[in-house]
Amino acid sequence: MASPEGTDGEGMGCCGWFQVEAIVERKTGDTISDDESEEENETDTDVDGFIDNTLINNTQEDRETAQQLLQVQTAHADAQTLQKLKRKYIGSPLSDISNQQTVYREEVKRRLILSEDSGYGNTLETLETSQQVEYEKGNGCGSSQNGGSQNSNCSEHSVSNMDIDTNMETPTHQLQELFKSSNVQGRLHFKFKEVYGVPYTELVRTFKSDSTCCNDWICAIFGVNETLAEALKTILKPQCVYYHMQCLTCSWGVIVMMLIRYICGKNRKTITKSLSSILNVPQEQMLIQPPKLRSPAVALYFYKTAMSNISEVYGETPEWIQRQTQLQHSLQDNQFELSKMVQWAFDNEVTDDSQIAFLYAQLADIDSNAQAFLKSNMQAKYVKDCGIMCRHYKRAQQQQMNMCQWIKHICSKVDEGGDWKPIVQFLRYQGVDFISFLSYFKLFLQGTPKHNCLVLCGPPNTGKSCFAMSLINFFQGSVISFVNSQSHFWLQPLDNAKLGLLDDATDTCWRYIDDYLRNLLDGNPISLDRKHKQLVQIKCPPVIITTNVNPMQDAKLRYLHSRISVFKFENPFPLDNNGNPVYELSNVNWKCFFERTWSRLNLDNDEDKENNGDSIPTFRCVPEQNTRLL
């Protein structure tokens, strides 16, 4: 074998090393190169070359270099650990470079579909997204030149895209996108059906006006905070007598659906403002309509869901749910009886057909017969028949009463607490002798011949019509107008009255009375023409006539002078500073007036003295039911 390079002889071990050092360093007889400094070997510091002083000077620098290296290594290790965590919890990076182009195309397609072309801003965002994807594909994610760093960049890009997609699916973002929709109500109805499984329109009836009041409402509120939804159950208790609340969660957040009955009727505006302030939800995220009260399906839905654990129920169940879900209420549903409707109209003195229909329909919640009336297809016929029968009964009852019984009957319907003095003071203010007026008024109420007509005469604005109208209103009398004198039936209202009034008679009217109505002023029986009915013979009731013309001063009306009694009202009607009458001529005061002057007007009836009970018999048109057990 060849000897090792740089050795002569067979030096081995340490001896060989020193021999090599001696040979390499310098040989005997070699010339010293000019490049070498002779002074360097001749100095006294040749011994210093054996000690390396640079190690002592550079110790601090070596330590700092080691710390920097350690920091770099630690940061690299942390980056690798973080990358592993991202791959584990977020998703693996794009490891296959050949599939990167396909993956990015799918991502771009997904992001383009998610974006809505609803404005200039959204279009720019879509273009910027596509340009950014193409730029990243050209910078390394689509090539294989960057190795591991390329995988790291692609992983970070996929993580950022995933964060964007996650943010777009939040409930707040979806509700914001809802407001951009052209049909917000449609999307709310669709979401309600998707969550609750029943269409909202099947539970409610539509109120077009926001000002219509109702006690029962069905409210659906979308995107409610969960804490506020729980607090709503406590806040609503002082405002309502019943609520049925359900809270379900979806991608939009919490959807609250409740059937609520308020203490008093409220409209949609009031409810919307109240719930919006409590739940911090805009009005566009609410559906508020009244329920279908006559739908068995709606009643059954709330009845069954109230027994489940998803509902929170407070208060007593509404009667419209009980009536349609409980057997007891189902057995109580009867057929319609016209006699009960007539009895109700007679007791409440409702004789007008429109009032009968409207007021009786409002009793459907508490009256089974009214409910059966609403279910009937012959409501118009029932209303007409009820009005006719009620008017027949009222007329027959009135004809059976004399004037004393009638005054007692109408006084029983007026409240207590009146004062008779304002009426007397007003008569004295007009210069009317109260004793003379009371004497004639007694004969006037009895219908004495030649004393059947009382005339109030005087200048305008003296209170003639006010005094007469207040008395007619108390007596529930009838008013006739001379403007209808061309008709044969203008006196027909006197057929059903205990007292009549002809207001503001002129010269022409007095000529007509002098020509055709002398018997009417006498208080004798007259023949009265009625529309669509045969002629009827009646005794004309007492009549009050107000006029600005004094018939006693007209010689052409001399045949009427013995048939009428004139009281002059010459002073202006007194008013206070607020424009109210100084002397109040109300029903309560007239009641007190008749009670005070009852004996002076000779209204005591012999039949009443014999019968200590009620002189007016109680009318009853409903057959009595036998409640005895068989």
Curated annotation (Swiss-Prot):
It is an enzyme of class 5 (isomerase). Residues 32-46 have a biased composition (Acidic residues). GO terms for biological process: DNA replication. Residues 167-333 are annotated as: DNA-binding region. It holds the Pfam family PPV_E1_DBD. PROSITE patterns: SF3_HELICASE_1 (PS51206). A motif (Nuclear localization signal) lies at residues 86-88. It is found in: Host nucleus. The modification Phosphoserine is found at S92. Residues 156-166 have a biased composition (Polar residues). Keywords: ATP-binding, DNA replication, DNA-binding, Early protein, Helicase, Host nucleus, Hydrolase, Isomerase, Isopeptide bond, Nucleotide-binding, Phosphoprotein, Ubl conjugation. It comes from the Viruses. Residues 142-155 have a biased composition (Low complexity). Its EC number is 5.6.2.4. There is a cross-link at K539 (Glycyl lysine isopeptide (Lys-Gly) (interchain with G-Cter in SUMO)). Phosphorylated. Sumoylated. One of its GO terms (cellular component) is host cell nucleus. Residues 432-582 form the SF3 helicase domain. Gene3D superfamilies: 3.40.1310.10, P-loop containing nucleotide triphosphate hydrolases, Zinc finger, large T-antigen D1 domain. Can form hexamers. Interacts with E2 protein; this interaction increases E1 DNA binding specificity. Interacts with host DNA polymerase subunit POLA2. Interacts with host single stranded DNA-binding protein RPA1. Interacts with host TOP1; this interaction stimulates the enzymatic activity of TOP1. Belongs to the papillomaviridae E1 protein family. This is Replication protein E1. The gene is E1.
